[in-house]
């Protein structure tokens, strides 16, 4: 009887810990929503909240017009242990801090270890924005090439920007070539892209444009208010263009 009670208490404790973890992960997602990060879209997996699906849209510099799928992998003890979340791209991304073998993003220079009371996932995504906006700056404070994730790309970035840019474009094209691939998972939260179809997506795009015009008119008139609403990705002549009324 005592053993049964002990087992029941253990199960109840585990269930409570799981529920608490789910609430903390949901809070992380809400914080990301409140930050309104430009060009990054993430959502926890329906089946496993420790795995998130994400898409990054580059808008400036070397990575302008890029579209990179990635996953965020959280440790079993997240957010209460010291394990830093992992970001892994679906395809090879040419960048000084992306491993060419595992496609993982090196976060160690910004997050030596996870501090549950201070660090949050929105900060990780902000960091990702920053290192793609300025890849050279992202490795400026790293003491030696050997400490970096992609030493060959570092040398190329420092010595031959044109060659670096060409390799970046190759990785962008490779990623875009697979953007419409069939999902590798049946998870309903997996982010799916569809090619632009005038009869289906045209009315939505027009609604977005009208809402943007209305918001712009309101703001110019001193009405204030935050812009919220639909987002879309239009495919035309090989280009992806994020559209939103934010």
UniProtKB/Swiss-Prot annotation:
| Signal sequence region | none
Superkingdom, natural source: Eukaryota
What CDD domains does this protein's entry cite?
A: UEV_AKTIP (cd23814)
- One protein family per Pfam: UQ_con
Q: Which processes are annotated in GO (biological process)? A: defense response to bacterium; sperm individualization
**InterPro entries the record matches:** UBQ-conjugat_E2_core (IPR000608), UBQ-conjugating_enzyme/RWD (IPR016135)
Annotated ranges, domain UBC core: 20-177
Report the sequence similarity comment from the record: Belongs to the ubiquitin-conjugating enzyme family. FTS subfamily.
Q: What is this protein called?
A: Protein crossbronx
| Gene source species | Drosophila grimshawi (Hawaiian fruit fly)
Which gene carries the instructions for this protein?
A: cbx
